[in-house]
Amino acid sequence: MSLDNKTLNKPLIFATGSSIRKDIAKSFGINCDFIKSEVDEELIKLNFQGNKYHELAIQLATEKSLTISDQYKDYYVVGVDQVCCINNEILNKPGNKENAIFSLKKLSGNTHYQNCGMAICLNGKIVWQSSAVAELTMKPLSLDQIEEYVELDKPFNCSGSYKFESHGKDLFSNVKGSEYTIQGLDIDQLLDILIKEGIING
C-alpha cells in the first residue's frame, strides 16, 4: 500500500482525538479533519452484554462515528475504538501512575487481547463496520520493572497501560496481530474500504 498522500474524493472526518490514530492515518497519506467525538463510553460498556469484546469495540466506534455524522452532512465519518481485555475483564485507560501499575501487574506473565473496532457512517447511517483482534503475551515483570516502565513511557492514556509504539513493545514475549491494531487503528482494513468506497485514491 502506497504511503504517498491520498487524494480525498469525498469529504472525510476521523471522529477521534487520539494522537496516535492521527499519526497512523497521516503516515499513510490520509489528510482529513480530525474531530473528537463525545460519547458516554462508560455507559456503553456498562450496558454491554456478553464477552465478545470486538463487538463492544465496534459499538463504541459506531457511536462515535454516528455522533459526528449527525453534525456534518455528506461527510463520511470514521469512528474507531479499542477494548483491552484479560480473562473477561475490561482494562480501561489508567489515567494515572497508580492505575497503570495496577493494570500492568494483572497483565504481567499473562495473555490479553486488544480489540479494535471501526465504523464508517454517512448522514447518520452506517456504511461499514469491522474489527480486528491482537493477542499479546506479556513477559513476567517484577514490580520494579513495571514501575520503571511506567516512569519511562507514562502510558496514562493508553489502552492496556502501555505504549506499544514506544518502549511498550519490549514488554512482550509473544504478539499475534498487527502493530496498528494494537495501537488502536487497523489501517490496512480501513484503507481498503476507503478505496473501495471511492473516498480516497489507492
Which residues does each PLM region occupy?
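N-terminal polybasic phosphate/anion-binding patch
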Residues: 1-76, 89, 141, 188-191, ...
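Active-site-adjacent loop/tail segments of enzyme domains
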Residues: 56, 82-112, 138
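Residue-level signal for inorganic ion chemistry
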Residues: 25, 61, 81, 100, ...
